[in-house]
Amino acid sequence: MFDNFVVPNLLPAAPEIFLATMALAILMIDLLVKDSRRTVTFVLTQLTLIGCAAIQFATSTGEITYTFSNMFVDDLMSDLLKLFLYMTVVIVMFYSRGYVIDRESMNKGEYYVLALFATLGMMVMISANHFLTIYIGLELLSLSLYAMVAMNRDSVVSTEAAMKYFVLGALASGLLLYGMSMIYGATGTLEITGIAERLYGGGVNKSVLVFGLVFLVAGLAFKLGVVPFHMWIPDVYQGAPTSVTLFIGSAPKLAAFAIVIRLLVNGLITLAADWQAMLVILSVLSMAIGNLAAIAQTNLKRMLAYSAISHMGFMLLGIVTGVVGGDARYALNAYSSSMFYVISYVLMSAGTFGMILMMSRAGFEAEELDDYKGLNKRSPWFAGIMLMLMFSMAGVPFFIGFFAKFSVLQAVVAAGPGYMWLAIVAVLFSLIGAFYYLRVVKLMYFDAPADETPLSAPMDMRILISANGLAVALLGIFPQVIMSLCAYALLRSL
């Protein structure tokens, strides 16, 4: 029975194995340790993530390595995205600490364990080379997030948001699975590299493939939160506890980018003309509806939700312009610009939601725009940090957000005259988007505060928020640090 069994190479998946083991151990330890502040659970969670980063460094070979019967791949792209993922989740956990302690219904060990399992799901997605691996990682992430959104059981809004997220998430998973089944029916394989080989070989029913591709792109669009599959984003961002909104609004974007590259670029590049046409529509609609709807919002979390939709639409421009008329010479430049954009957005989003968490306290959620009136009078330093984050999101020179937009736009322009209209549309909607970011700056600096008490926050929170804001500014001066990392990782992975 076991004559043909081959022991897989476990080394490429060592960080995933370590994280899964530690998540289960932390769950058991949390039951045994009596600690109302969950300090032990928090510290173990952070050490686990740092341990994952150390293992990732130690086991990285820089080569493309397949294991588990080619279902799992380890390459430089996955290494880089996972390292940014660990860093993001560590920051998210630090930002969330005070908020979670102040809310009894959330101050449980399960919060940290669910965050670890969600991280594990993202790690699996980033390294997936098989439809089933993608689906397993996606469901592990989604189920963890559904539970995290519903953790504040005292809030009807949170419960409602969790239900909407669950129902629409199940629908998206169904679309993705149906698309995968159609592509499997046409190619006879579930392996992403195997699908690419079959398509290059020819003799595949293209009508079935394109039909499957439509469902696949719809499922991916939901996970990215782009129009018209964005319905869940505003309600979930606003309804979820702010610490969970921070988690949803940052780390999963890295995993979503990875599966777009794995599925569309690694697997279905021969169908580029078909999926590019779909992504152009999704991108333009997302930039239009995201930016225009954000203007009307009075709730900062909801405004940032529509902002996220527009940012993901902008990111898709880089994916769209990778292959032009069958010519892939611009692919590395285009895809690395999108990767840089996603990493920049995650950094900016983490800092912005971190500011909301710092201003929130027990019984008070600092999520209305009016809560930021006169912040400069209450805390000039943190008003300055928020200003840098808003300027960066708006794409004001010389912050990281500006260079993220600039790198994508130059990739679009380099693709040729046929794409020039896309660059013009992107610039126009970026200018419209600048309005609602600058409105926050106006409220902080030119309106009178309703509450003039100085802003108080723990020292570790103050240091981390300050570092986050300064990173947005410094990486705007030296963007080539991350740009070159993205380009090199994709050069060695595609």
UniProtKB/Swiss-Prot annotation:
Its EC number is 7.1.1.-. InterPro entries: NADH-Q_OxRdtase_suN/2, ND/Mrp_TM. The chain crosses the membrane at residues 13-33, 39-59, 76-96, 109-129, 131-151, 166-186, 209-229, 243-265, 275-295, 304-324, 339-359, 382-402, 412-432, 463-483. The keyword Cell membrane applies. The keyword Magnesium does not apply. One of its GO terms (biological process) is ATP synthesis coupled electron transport. It is an enzyme of class 7 (translocase). It catalyses: a quinone + NADH + 5 H(+)(in) = a quinol + NAD(+) + 4 H(+)(out). It is a multi-pass membrane protein. Coiled coil: none annotated. One of its GO terms (molecular function) is quinone binding. Signal peptide: none annotated. NCBIfam families: NDH_I_N (TIGR01770), PRK05777.1-5 (NF004442). NDH-1 is composed of 14 different subunits. Subunits NuoA, H, J, K, L, M, N constitute the membrane sector of the complex. Belongs to the complex I subunit 2 family. This is NADH-quinone oxidoreductase subunit N. The lineage of its organism: Bacteria, Pseudomonadati, Pseudomonadota, Betaproteobacteria, Rhodocyclales. The gene is nuoN.
